[in-house]
């Protein structure tokens, strides 16, 4: 970290660190949004890392994957594998944004928004991270930019309610 500080770096973005399937895919196959993945150390180690970054004036930004989940996600397991997604309100049968990766979250479903808002607040409060980079941000939306903006605003408001200066970066290719 001293070397990074000497370079003048003022922020570090970590790839997805929440629990994911296996030890491959760099965290982009998420299943639990409130748990640190086993491959990245202990909660205490992450807290120490964030504290050490902050001592050097370096912000810590987490890459969050809220557009899809794997079959190991508890909300996916509530419904038998292979059943019609139409019976599972947590996920879209067909992604409205055109990218089909794992199971696509239904961000129009109020409990989905509540769960993700709480996850964002959790990492800010428990680990003192400084903000988020949202992977495949158009995956948060319906079929229009207005829908994406509405849902992103919902999450931003949840973040700002606990950390007014937090970063919230939308990323889409």
Each model region followed by its residue ranges:
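Substrate-binding/active-site clefts of carbohydrate-active enzymes
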Residues: 1-161, 172
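Glycoside hydrolase catalytic-domain groove-lining segments
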Residues: 55, 166-167
């Amino acid at each position: 970290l001293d070397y990074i500080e000497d370079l003048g770096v003022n922020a570090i973005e970590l790839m997805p660190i929440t629990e994911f399937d296996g030890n491959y895919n760099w965290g982009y196959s998420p299943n639990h949004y409130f748990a640190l993945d086993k491959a990245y150390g202990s909660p205490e180690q992450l807290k120490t890392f964030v504290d050490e970054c902050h001592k050097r004036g370096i912000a810590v930004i987490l890459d969050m994957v809220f557009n899809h989940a794997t079959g190991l996600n508890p909300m996916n397991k509530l419904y038998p594998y292979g059943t019609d997604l139409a019976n599972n309100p947590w996920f879209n049968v067909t992604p409205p944004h055109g990218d089909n990766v794992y199971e696509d979250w239904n961000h129009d479903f109020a409990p989905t928004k509540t769960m993700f808002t709480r996850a964002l607040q959790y990492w800010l409060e428990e680990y003192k991270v400084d903000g988020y980079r949202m992977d495949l941000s158009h995956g948060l939306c319906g079929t229009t930019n207005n829908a994406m903006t509405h849902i992103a605003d919902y999450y931003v408001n949840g973040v700002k309610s606990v950390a007014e200066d937090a970063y919230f970066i939308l990323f889409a290719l």
